[in-house]
């Protein structure tokens, strides 16, 4: 009886779990927008925001061997005179021509390139000495827009900053002879509050705007101070890797800068096709579905995050070889993250901009690598068809929400779930009957 049960279980596994061959198997379907990370808006829509390294990307990437070895990450040390404004202090530094678009609040709606979005900074209701008036170990963060005026803001940028390049900077004291409090707070406390609604073509968002003069260096110990000028939002982390259209952003899962990394939840999977193609174990103790692609493989033949990372790095190496790009440009490519296949037109335009910067526009003519999957598979990037992913029809738009059906959890129809329980039930019955008979034999 036990043998027959095992045989039936094996047959069911072969029938239900036979790896499928997709009409258009996706070994690595990715898009490469200019954004570094994605963030979620209400409703779970995937958005991208740019960390802009224009206007001189090629110049400062090709003049140095590696970006990680430059002063971009650590800032620049500079001597500044007492009572010098931050805008004046950064003149002649690497940050002078740096435009940074930073979003620290995931409640914003999508914005255009002409919009300059500033960080989420706590302010008091009446513009008093709240967080914006404190320097702390990290220095005071301030946005500089087209002159000697600095802005510390939450919500909407000042109107005069719309469409202009700006610098989001922090000033950090580096010596004891430097700054007592980092920056003077007297002028900051006089900032004006403007609680209004900020509207773009994509919608409106309410926010508090605090307009302040540029902060001034202050010290009673010496005539000059030593400080470090750093970008407000540093270079993004190394890429997270995920399969196209098979992930969503987990709500409230953001790093310290407010940027969401790629994370799976159960609603992001295309259902039965994903399970059949990527493999799972139908049996007691086996994984019904691959809930998270975080390096821990659940199921037979499912690719891990490291697998995908290796593929992407291999492709980048091919780009390097084919186009003889400099190492600095390759590092720039590695720092460009990707989002799901349902890219907006804006992102597709930005893809072309990257191609112009890196002189690989011909390689980026298509937004995904779907046309080259066959070649990639022949080159060994896909170990087998079970390592490829079948794009669902239609493409699922990731959402964040509650699971309200069994198929969303298992990716499997209810009748398959019932078959599983029936098989497990038969096994339990066989084990119980066999145990009772064995117990009776022992008692005799």
UniProtKB/Swiss-Prot annotation:
* Its membrane topology: Single-pass type I membrane protein
Q: Mind telling me which InterPro entries this protein's record contains? A: Fusion_F0_Isavirus
> What residue ranges lie in the Cytoplasmic compartment?
435-444
Q: Segment Fusion peptide: which positions? A: 277-292
Annotated keywords: Disulfide bond, Glycoprotein, Host membrane, Membrane, Signal, Transmembrane, Transmembrane helix, Virion
Q: Which residues form the signal peptide?
A: 1-17
Which residue ranges are assigned to the Extracellular compartment in the record's topology? 18-413
State where it is primarily located: virion
Q: Coiled-coil annotation: which residues?
A: none
UniProt KW Ligase keyword: no
Query: Organism's domain of life?
Result: Viruses
Gene Ontology CC terms, in alphabetical order: host cell membrane; membrane; virion membrane
Q: Which Pfam families match?
A: Fusion_F0
Residues carrying covalently attached carbohydrate according to the record: 110, 359
Entry's localization field: Virion membrane; Host membrane
Assembly and partners? Homotrimer of disulfide-linked F1-F2. Interacts with Hemagglutinin esterase.
Quote the function comment for this protein: Class I viral fusion protein. Under the current model, the protein has at least 3 conformational states: pre-fusion native state, pre-hairpin intermediate state, and post-fusion hairpin state. During viral and target cell membrane fusion, the heptad repeat (HR) regions assume a trimer-of-hairpins structure, positioning the fusion peptide in close proximity to the C-terminal region of the ectodomain. The formation of this structure appears to drive apposition and subsequent fusion of viral and target cell membranes.
**What name goes with this protein?**
Fusion glycoprotein F0
- Record organism: Infectious salmon anemia virus (isolate Atlantic salmon/Norway/810/9/99)
């Amino acid at each position: 009886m036990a043998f027959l049960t095992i045989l039936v279980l094996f047959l069911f596994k072969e029938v239900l779990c036979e790896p499928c061959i997709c009409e258009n198997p996706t070994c690595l379907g990715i898009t490469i927008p200019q954004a570094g990370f994605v963030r979620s808006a209400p409703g779970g829509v995937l958005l991208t925001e740019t960390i802009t390294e224009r206007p001189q990307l090629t110049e400062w990437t090709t003049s140095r061997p590696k970006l990680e070895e430059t002063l971009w990450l650590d800032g620049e040390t500079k001597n500044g005179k007492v009572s010098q404004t931050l805008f004046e202090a950064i003149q002649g530094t690497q940050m002078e021509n740096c435009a940074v678009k930073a979003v620290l609040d995931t409640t914003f709606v999508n914005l255009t390139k002409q919009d300059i979005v500033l960080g989420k900074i706590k302010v008091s209701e009446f513009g008093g000495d709240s967080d914006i008036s404190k320097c702390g170990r990290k220095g005071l963060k301030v946005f500089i827009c087209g002159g000697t005026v600095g802005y510390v803001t939450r919500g909407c940028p000042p109107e005069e900053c719309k469409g202009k390049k700006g610098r989001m900077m922090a000033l950090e004291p580096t010596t004891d002879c430097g700054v007592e409090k980092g920056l003077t707070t007297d002028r900051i406390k006089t900032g004006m509050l403007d609680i209004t609604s900020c509207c773009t073509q994509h919608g409106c968002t309410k926010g508090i705007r605090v307009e302040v003069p540029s902060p001034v260096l202050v010290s009673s110990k010496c005539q000059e101070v030593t400080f470090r000028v750093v970008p407000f939002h540093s270079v993004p982390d190394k890429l997270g890797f995920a399969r196209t259209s098979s992930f969503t952003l987990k709500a409230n899962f953001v790093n310290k800068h407010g940027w969401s990394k790629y994370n799976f939840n159960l609603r992001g999977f295309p259902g039965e096709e994903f399970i059949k193609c990527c493999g799972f174990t139908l049996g007691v103790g086996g994984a019904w579905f691959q809930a998270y692609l975080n390096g821990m493989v659940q199921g037979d033949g499912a690719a891990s995050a490291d697998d995908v990372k290796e593929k992407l790095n291999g492709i980048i190496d091919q780009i390097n070889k084919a186009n003889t790009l400099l190492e600095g440009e390759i590092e720039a490519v590695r720092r460009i993250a990707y989002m799901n296949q349902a890219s907006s037109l804006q992102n597709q335009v930005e893809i072309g901009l990257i191609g112009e910067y890196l002189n690989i526009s011909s390689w980026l003519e298509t937004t995904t690598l779907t046309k080259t999957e066959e070649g990639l598979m022949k080159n060994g990037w896909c170990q087998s068809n079970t390592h490829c992913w079948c794009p669902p029809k239609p493409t699922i738009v990731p959402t964040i929400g509650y699971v309200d059906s069994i198929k969303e959890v298992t990716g499997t129809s209810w009748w398959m779930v019932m078959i599983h329980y029936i098989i497990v039930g038969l096994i339990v019955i066989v084990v119980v009957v066999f145990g009772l008979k064995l117990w009776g034999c022992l008692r005799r």
